[in-house]
Curated annotation (Swiss-Prot):
The lineage of its organism: Bacteria, Pseudomonadati, Pseudomonadota, Gammaproteobacteria, Legionellales. This is DNA translocase FtsK. Homohexamer. Forms a ring that surrounds DNA. The gene is ftsK. PROSITE patterns: FTSK. It comes from Coxiella burnetii (strain RSA 493 / Nine Mile phase I). Belongs to the FtsK/SpoIIIE/SftA family. ATP binds at residues 439-444.
Length: 778
């Protein structure tokens, strides 16, 4: 056994030794082949006809060839035989040596490679024969330094053999075919793979050139490289106006440049409204109380960048299999809208589903897709600007659109994506629902709405009820003359204020019905006309025992603003929802309007009843598509940018408008509020926040309409005590009598009416307050 192991070990040693010698021999041959190739290449480069050579006999003292006389003979021989092909002969020899000796670690012997070597040798000969023949036909004697011909003697013989049969064109075609076959056999190159690789690189190069030169196809790229006069003769570029162009179905094949819409220049009215536009003592705030915007407004994108961005959008959509062309671009203060004309048969929903992928590929925070643009057959793609512009309250309130608005309930929402001011009328909404997450700009937008109301209306035109559970946002307006009651911070007081609004709504409806008018504008016009005619109308709802009833006065608009009504829904419960729905259904004609905001856009806060009766919504940035659908009944708010970026859904419209809300500084709000406090003192209405005990809403409204028990008046056993209490406290209201003596609303109302008839208290004034006329007993 030991002998066997020894024999086996000796045999393995011999195999390893032979393999090692074979490897070294192959490496040595490879080095010799490379050296021969380098020698021949240098000899060919330094060839000169004055040197001695194989094709001629000459005696010289000095050989010009760098490789000496041997190199001169060798170079002369190869050039004489194959002509210009001699210059690639060294490279072919080096390549053949590298192919033959490269796999030095293979276990197979050289004889097993003979079929492959024979094919490579055949390819080598085909390259020399076909290449030299082509050189002999087309190059000939171009270079006088050659010993014979551009194709050598071999090329001349091959050309003379084929030329009489196939002529020049046929001979060249046959030789090119054999040359390509020879390259394939010698190098192993696959022409199909080469063409496929060439096509892929050509597409990549085309995309790169398209982005750089503003083209999207080879046709576009070729035309973009032509002189401008040639381009004008080749194609007429359509001018895309503000109206939608009539695009044919193959519009994607047309050469078109997207229209870059110019930013609008806002018309600023510099003069101040220091005098009221109506009768009264109060004056409107001055615009100088607000901070003017900086004048250095720089565009976020230049026109060239917008053109390049348009092409990039088209290319990114093409990467996802969507063919589209940008036909118009609308740059704005915060976002830029690209209007896309989709190819025929492409659904807009495909683009919508790619919003996140497009945002990633375009390297932006978010992308919003507008599937329907009214009046146009395109879709919108909104991208955030790299430099965001700050929209200030001054530049919106100072615009011609706001200053020329006739309504006293004009709201300034901000600017749209094109930079145009968005001015709306609260009276036409007639109520507004605002929702958005914390930090999205909701409270700042409420301040902007409040300022736009205060800059349009005096206390004679507008009265406010502000509900602020946070005790921070709206408390700065405490003490302004527009308030009906101090800023409400307790949610139970807020419910009482809404109940008072219901009673006031019913009272106004009864007044309008008695005059035969349909809304508060008709009522005020009729009352004003009667006053100017010298025959004022009397209040039909109040009868006086002595003298005549009080005269009717114009009724102000009433706006209830709640910064967070979700707390009301939690604390008070379903009763608040019933009150809100009742006001939303009927209060428009009575001149009572609601603006409710919440940071919890959930179905338990924004209920179906509230949504059905408040069709106008403003959605700021939310965290999910579900929250967006809760507010707008559609997605989109989750793609907003925050900081005042909002979607405004107008009544009767299913397409929200993107608006950038104005930024209002705390200092500006303080200055305006202080100005209003100095101009006039507040005139609060007593009893608005008085609670009504356990009386439910139906009984409350029935009492407000005059129903219930007939007991009351001077015959009431509590009348004397009530008169004494009123004279002592110097305050009177139905709610205070009801709360003090624990009686029903209708009974307390009759006691107050009896006091008015007896001259103890004055008739109800325009703001609902009464004055105690009876002297104090002290």
């Amino acid at each position: 056994m030991g002998r066997r192991k020894g024999k086996k070990s000796a045999k393995e040693t011999g195999v390893l030794l032979r393999r090692h010698l074979r490897y070294r021999l192959r490496e040595g041959c490879f080095i010799l082949a490379l050296a021969f190739s380098a020698f021949l290449f240098i000899a060919l480069l330094s060839y000169h006809r004055s040197d001695p050579g194989w094709s001629h006999s000459i005696v010289v003292k000095h050989v010009a060839n760098l490789t000496g006389e041997a190199g001169a003979w060798l170079s002369d021989f190869t050039l004489y035989m194959v002509g210009y092909l001699a210059y690639i002969f060294p490279l072919m020899v080096a390549f053949a040596a590298w192919v033959f000796f490269r796999n030095r670690h293979e276990e197979q012997d050289i004889p097993t490679k003979w079929p492959l070597l024979i094919l490579r040798a055949v390819g080598f000969l085909l390259i020399l024969l076909a290449g030299s023949a082509l050189a002999a036909i087309h190059l000939g004697t171009l270079d006088a330094n050659l010993p014979y011909n551009g194709g050598g003697i071999i090329g001349v013989v091959m050309a003379k053999s084929l030329f009489p049969i196939f002529n020049t064109a046929g001979t060249s075609l046959i030789l090119i075919a054999f040359l390509l076959i020879g390259i394939t056999l010698f190098t192993g190159l696959s022409w199909f793979q080469f063409l496929e690789l060439l096509g892929k690189n050509a597409i990549k190069f085309t995309k790169f050139c398209a982005i750089r030169l503003g083209a999207i196809s080879w046709k576009d790229l070729f035309l973009s490289l032509l002189p401008s006069q040639d381009k004008r003769e080749a194609v007429t570029v359509p001018k895309i106006k503000r109206v939608e162009p009539d695009l044919v179905p193959d519009a994607l094949d047309m050469i078109s440049t997207p229209k870059i819409a110019e930013r609008p220049k806002l018309e600023i009215i510099d003069h101040e409204f220091k005098t009221p536009r109506f009768k009264g003592s109060a004056i409107l705030p001055e615009l100088s109380l607000l901070d003017k915007p900086s004048q250095d407004h720089t565009l976020s994108y230049s026109e060239e960048e917008l053109q390049q961005k348009s092409r990039e959008v088209e290319l990114r959509l093409a990467d996802f299999g969507i063919q589209a062309k940008v036909v118009a671009v609308h740059p704005g203060p915060v976002v830029t809208r690209f209007e896309l004309q989709l190819a025929a048969g492409t659904k807009a929903s495909r683009v919508t589903n790619l919003a996140k992928d497009l945002a990633r590929s375009l390297s932006v925070i978010s992308v919003r897709i507008v599937e329907v643009i009214p009046g146009k057959s395109v879709i919108g793609l909104e991208l955030p600007n790299k430099n965001r512009e700050v929209v200030t309250i001054y530049e919106v309130l100072a615009t011609k659109q706001y200053q020329n608005a006739r309504s006293s309930l004009t709201l300034a929402l901000g600017k749209d994506i094109g930079g145009h001011p968005v001015i709306v009328d609260l009276a036409k909404m007639p109520h507004l629902l605002v929702a958005g997450t914390t930090g999205s700009g909701k409270s700042v937008s409420l301040n902007a709405m409040l300022l736009s109301l205060l800059y349009k209306s005096t206390p004679q035109q507008l009265r406010l009820i502000l509900i602020d559970p946070k005790m921070l946002e709206l408390s700065v307006y405490e003490g302004i003359p527009h308030l009906l009651t101090p800023v409400v911070t307790d949610m139970k007081d807020a419910a009482a204020a809404l109940r008072w609004c219901v009673v006031e709504m019913e009272r106004r409806y009864r007044l309008m019905a008695s005059l035969g008018v349909r809304n508060i504008l008709g009522y005020n016009a009729k009352v004003k006309e009667a006053i100017e005619a010298g025959a004022p109308l009397l209040d039909p709802l109040q009868a006086a025992a002595e003298g005549k009833p009080p005269e009717l006065q114009e009724l102000p608009q009433l706006v209830v603003i709640a910064d967070e009504f979700a707390d009301m829904m939690v604390v008070v419960g379903k009763k608040v929802e019933t009150l809100i729905v009742r006001l939303a259904q009927k209060a428009r004609a009575a001149g009572i309007h609601l603006i409710f905001a919440t940071q919890r856009p959930s179905v338990d806060v924004i209920t179906g009843l509230i949504k059905a009766n408040i069709p106008t919504r403003v959605a700021f940035q939310v965290s999910s598509k579900i929250d967006s659908r809760t507010i707008l009944d559609q997605q989109g708010a989750e793609q907003l940018l925050g900081h005042g970026d909002l979607l405004y859904l107008a009544p009767g419209s299913g397409v929200p408008v993107r608006v950038h809300g104005p930024y209002v500084k705390d200092e500006e709000v303080h200055r305006v509020a202080e100005y209003l406090r100095e101009s006039s003192e507040p005139n609060y209405v007593e009893g608005i926040l008085d609670e009504m005990g356990a009386q439910d809403l139906s009984g409350f409204v029935e009492a407000a309409l005059g129903g219930g028990s007939e007991e009351g008046g001077e015959s009431d056993p509590l009348y004397d005590e009530a008169v004494e209490a009123v004279i002592r406290s110097r305050r009177v209201s139905v709610s205070s009598i009801q709360r003090r003596f624990k009686i029903g609303y209708n009974r307390a109302a009759r006691i107050v009416e009896a006091m008015e008839a007896a001259g103890v208290v004055s008739p109800m004034e325009n703001n609902g307050a009464r004055e105690v006329l009876a002297p104090s007993k002290e």
